[in-house]
């Protein structure tokens, strides 16, 4: 597991109040991890803070799974 992947999974677990072991790459935030719309907004903000990036709304809407978040962080990190 890469450093970025580990950091993303830790943020997701903390933001959604789930065990890190539940945060696997294929999990969807809403369907699998119980996130609501506010959770997803807070999650995007936490990712922005952690990686020093700004995620436009149109991109944020596409980040719906753990793997989406990892890929986005890998591609856009500061």
Curated annotation (Swiss-Prot):
The modification O-(pantetheine 4'-phosphoryl)serine is found at residue 37. It is found in: Cytoplasm. The gene is acpP. PROSITE patterns: CARRIER, PHOSPHOPANTETHEINE. Belongs to the acyl carrier protein (ACP) family. This is Acyl carrier protein. It comes from the Bacteria. One of its GO terms (cellular component) is membrane. GO terms for biological process: lipid A biosynthetic process. Pfam families: PP-binding. The lineage of its organism: Bacteria, Pseudomonadati, Pseudomonadota, Betaproteobacteria, Burkholderiales. Pathway: Lipid metabolism; fatty acid biosynthesis. GO terms for molecular function: acyl binding; acyl carrier activity; phosphopantetheine binding.
